[in-house]
Amino acid sequence: MRKEAIYHRPADNFAYAYDSETLHLRLRTKKDDIDRVELLHGDPYDWQNGAWQFQMMPMRKTGSDELFDYWFAEVKPPYRRLRYGFVLYSGEEKLVYTEKGFYFEVPTDDTAYYFCFPFLHRVDLFEAPDWVKDTVWYQIFPERFANGNPSISPEGSRPWGSEDPTPTSFFGGDLQGIIDHLDYLVDLGITGIYLTPIFRSPSNHKYDTADYFEVDPHFGDKETLKTLIDRCHEKGIRVMLDAVFNHCGYEFAPFQDVWKNGESSKYKDWFHIHEFPLQTEPRPNYDTFRFVPQMPKLNTANPEVKRYLLDVATYWIREFDIDGWRLDVANEIDHEFWREFRQEVKALKPDVYILGEIWHDAMPWLRGDQFDAVMNYPFTDGVLRFFAKEEISARQFANQMMHVLHSYPNNVNEAAFNLLGSHDTSRILTVCGGDIRKVKLLFLFQLTFTGSPCIYYGDEIGMTGGNDPECRKCMVWDPMQQNKELHQHVKQLIALRKQYRSLRRGEISFLHADDEMNYLIYKKTDGDETVLVIINRSDQKADIPIPLDARGTWLVNLLTGERFAAEAETLCTSLPPYGFVLYAIEHW
């Protein structure tokens, strides 16, 4: 056994409370090194005749990445506390792995050998809103979705879709335009809208906030926003707003006061200022987002700033009943601020969704005291590299997805915000080189994966564009310019996701990933319900054997409704280039 690859720690993604009664435990071992693992566990105070009393249970291998295998066990400690270790088997070799190291036999004279989960406290639970697990999100960049009220469009706005956008161009998109097209979203199957910032700002993107308590007048007013949210709720759609608390805009009144009054300004400590007077060249002498002078960084450790921003967060929940906050540049704000943020917004609306924009490993923010989820860019990276760019093989892709899933606890994965693209990335059809078949595979995997999927406006009809600002083109409303086949594909997948709980909440298992032909087989399982997904990510027809003994069941093609009895031990399906199929497995 390769001892140096064996790893566990009683915290985070390796040991966590799944609910108020259940503990999840994981173990990492070298890939293909261990035959089986047993969990050794017991109450730390359960002793008889000088020996600690423990039980043994098998652990289940839940997946592998490029280097490691991952093992899993679920325990319900009767007294909500646990001491535990692992017994590993490889051929004739046996090792006991504990917090103090490795042993050949199980130590029973002292529980101090073992890993400890001291007590399962409900207050320590990671609990994301349950509704998020069933939500299909739709991200809207308000300035480019629809112009419902031309009378409030900014001066110099261009005719809708008349030209490609620039960083400073306006086309007049607004909140009324979103209201006017809610039926389109309902028909698609959308149950959550994520709006990029809507607060007063001089830019088209609104990430340089001037007033956090006012709707930008070119988007509408508070009454229009209230109407939008009420209409959404009537139609079963949740609404999430975007908060920019890392930095403000140049026109934010406190920053203007500092710019005018310098060191004598009462707001000077609201920002991270290195010296006075303020200057922007060659670089700002105050902290900013990136090095953008128009986006000064807020000092969230300052009690006045903290109170101001927390009041902003609670105001829009209390007065407008929003359902979530997406938090921009969340990783550059101190953890203490986010802990207080969570306490205040959850006290007001316990099932509000808190989503952080973090592009890297975000475990420090996902321990139950800060965020409910982060934007799952590691997922995005993997699916684009496999389906769109064809940079990695099927096995490498399966490994990467398993690494993503094992980086976080299961209850974190269930609420993860899974996106294919956004206002910060190139359009997926552009990344796919214009190949709609690849885009279909992207949506198929996204809408059958664990977590909460988000569609960037227009991707479902085949809009194109490179990085910002090209990815922020006006929504195409002319039916003749929309890809109806792609739209129908997305609509059908969303409907299937709603119909089959396993597609929303089931555990994913990769059954086979073929590097030679680049096909992928995985299943989603929830209780007795199983859906099998088979994908051919190659430009050649593939005859694919199904590594699943399904004898005694019906295989129902969810795309066509056809069904056939699985009577043979080995089944096979034939798929065209970039083809796919979904089977529900139903018992006779």
Swiss-Prot record:
The positions flagged as active site in the entry are: D328 (nucleophile), E357 (proton donor)
* Matching InterPro entries: Glyco_hydro_13_cat_dom, Glyco_hydro_13_lg-like_dom, Glyco_hydro_b, Glycoside_hydrolase_SF, Ig-like_fold, Malt_amylase-like_C, O16G_dom_2
Disulfide topology = none
Q: Give the keywords, sorted.
A: Calcium, Glycosidase, Hydrolase, Metal-binding
MF (Gene Ontology): calcium ion binding; D-glucose binding; identical protein binding; neopullulanase activity; protein homodimerization activity
Record text on cofactor binding: Binds 1 Ca(2+) ion per subunit.
Q: Which CDD domains match?
A: AmyAc_CMD, E_set_CDase_PDE_N
Report if keyword Iron-sulfur is assigned. Answer: no
In chain numbering, the residues marked as site (Transition state stabilizer) are D424
Task: Name the cofactor(s) required for activity, per the record.
Answer: Ca(2+)
Protein's GO biological process: carbohydrate metabolic process
Q: EC number(s) of the enzyme? A: 3.2.1.135
Q: Looking at the Swiss-Prot or TrEMBL record, what is one Pfam family this protein matches?
A: Alpha-amylase
Annotated substrate binding lies at H247, R326, H423, D424, D468, R472
Q: Which reaction does it catalyse?
A: Hydrolysis of pullulan to panose (6-alpha-D-glucosylmaltose)
Q: Which residues bind Ca(2+)?
A: N147, N149, S153, G172, D174
The entry assigns this protein to a family as follows: Belongs to the glycosyl hydrolase 13 family.
* Function summary: Hydrolyzes pullulan efficiently but only a small amount of starch. Endohydrolysis of 1,4-alpha-glucosidic linkages in pullulan to form panose. Also cleaves (1-6)-alpha-glucosidic linkages to form maltotriose.
| Assembly behavior | Homodimer.
Descriptive protein name: Neopullulanase
